[in-house]
Amino acid sequence: MSKSIVIVGAGINGLVAANYLKRSGHEVTLIEKKPSPGGACANESFIHNDIRYQYPSGASVLGLMQRFVFEETGLSTRLKTFSPESPKLAFFPNHKGPTYIYRDPNELDAELKNKWGESGDATAFRADESKIIDFIQSGYREGRTPSIDEANSVLGNDLVDLWIKGDARSLLDHYFESDLSKIYMAMTVTESGPVSLSEKYSAFTIPIMDSGSVFNGYYGFVFQGIWNLTQTLSEINIGLGVDTRLSSNLVDKD
């Protein structure tokens, strides 16, 4: 049965929800306070030598979206994307040259041992992280909220205590010996929000931030700016018949 649904907020979550609901046969109204859609995927511009340049004022890269969402919404046929496959470079003071953060766990393990004197096990870290990511992704399509009980059943208590319920500091101490390795891996937590590495459940931030599947857990770029993703999805939704109301306030509800 078709329903009339109002979604407040035209950020990426509101836009994706509107897309799926409209394609499922519902009447959808999307209300956004700002004059343009996008939420955190916003942009600003400046003029230099009579040329206007745009830059992201919020999010800048694409990484957490699931591939099936990227494809089913129609975004994959409308956008150009790029994810560099060359290793990231990590620089620390008093170290000659960069350390290469390889995607291949065995290459990464060898590099960390060579450059940072790492005697831990980066290969085991990535292998166990993949198990957690697989568990997280397993419920995305069904919209199923994961639970600790389900995690214990699928992953076992030891992995759950370490990777989900535990703190990031203890997690990194478990796999790594070098302070430089721990600092680098901890950046995933510190970049995502003001959470202490010693806080319970902070370990879960690491696999969560690597759980997108558009680029297989890595991050990439949208041609001409990440804001084109939300602008394009808004255009797709309007074409489907989503009633999109910008510069609007929600005054009351029934």
Predicted features by range, described:
Residues K3-D134:
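N-terminal glycine-rich phosphate/pyrophosphate-binding loop and immediately adjacent elements
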Residues S24, L171-Y175, T232, I236, ...:
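Generic, well-ordered alpha-helical scaffold segments in large soluble proteins
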Residues I31-E32, I183-Y184, L246:
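General beta-strand structural signal in soluble alpha/beta enzymes
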Residues E199-I208:
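Flexible hinge/switch segments at interdomain interfaces of large molecular machines
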Residues A10, V16, E107, A124, ...:
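Generic recognition of stable, solvent-exposed alpha-helical segments in well-folded globular domains
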Residues P37-A40, E191-V195, D252-K253:
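Flexible loop/turn segments at secondary-structure boundaries
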Residues I208-K253:
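Helical element adjacent to the flavin cofactor pocket in flavoenzyme catalytic cores
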Residues H95-K200:
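Rossmann-like flavin
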